[in-house]
């Protein structure tokens, strides 16, 4: 979807592009978070080139040092509420559905609160806990082995949140002898870490990027395309 198409459909007063500037915040929780060793170098170069071109064209490119684009968007949503429309296909951003509006660029449709509840089977305030229980191997978010969306939804409906699940885990691991409860009881810190990893930052120090900033945050293509 092109920028001009987005502007025509959504008719925003202004438009901003969020970029990643590291993930130091989450590396401190899990050093293996989003290990980039196997990331496609061609895709990285393409994203960097597009970012450079956006700045040349005078577009507003936003970043927060040490944080991800998700955190920039979450902060904007927290600051601007329903006036903010996030254009994203990232499921993690569904956590913000009560704060702002979300537009799916591939489906070309706005995601509603009922869409989110129907997809995940939990209340919107439980979505972060849902994502933490499920985990995400691609991002090195451990979660709980054997817990998928249906099981996570069942646990959250019964115990309310991760704290409630953790409080019940020792007793349930003994009384039920179920592997899922045993894994939760023996991996409490992993589950807490998973919750902290998926939690979005809503008070990021956002700055508008310049070409010099891109060098600082590691856009390797800048030297070639300057």
Where are these regions (language model features)?
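Non-catalytic nucleic-acid-binding/docking modules located in mid-to-C-terminal regions
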Residues: 4, 9-16, 38, 48, ...
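A conserved hydrophobic position in a structured secondary element of the catalytic/binding core
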Residues: 88-89, 157
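Acidic, divalent-metal-coordinating active-site segment for phosphoryl/phosphodiester hydrolysis
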Residues: 91-92, 150
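Noncatalytic, basic helical substrate-engagement surface that gates or grips nucleic-acid strands
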Residues: 1-87, 93-110, 192-193, 199-218
